[in-house]
Amino acid sequence: MSLSTEAKAKILAEFGRGANDTGSTEVQVALLTAQINHLQDHFKEHIHDHHSRRGLLRMVSARRKLLAYLKRTEAARYNELIQKLGLRR
């Protein structure tokens, strides 16, 4: 259920600050968002997959914490990121 290497590379190129930037908050949030969207599609077909749903909730929680950190430290980058990802806040 993880993202393909190509999908991750595309996200890194779009949201990363450099070629090897995998740890910045923006990249982490973008990767989590892609995984969350992938799991949401999975749940449309597999409604009773509660084990994966627990993982989804953990990802949503981690993304929420990262977004709160980014909003607290650098509000301009936060606003730009949620606009790019199409998240509502």
Curated annotation (Swiss-Prot):
Q: InterPro entries in the record, alphabetically?
A: Ribosomal_uS15, Ribosomal_uS15_bac-type, uS15_NS1_RNA-bd_sf
Q: Where is the signal peptide?
A: none
For this chain, one GO molecular function annotation is: structural constituent of ribosome
Q: Does the keyword Signal apply?
A: no
Record keywords: Ribonucleoprotein, Ribosomal protein, RNA-binding, rRNA-binding
* GO CC annotations on file: cytosolic small ribosomal subunit
Keyword rRNA-binding listed? The answer is yes
Lineage: superkingdom:
Bacteria
Of which family is this protein a member?
Belongs to the universal ribosomal protein uS15 family.
Assembly and partners are described as: Part of the 30S ribosomal subunit. Forms a bridge to the 50S subunit in the 70S ribosome, contacting the 23S rRNA.
What is the protein named? Small ribosomal subunit protein uS15
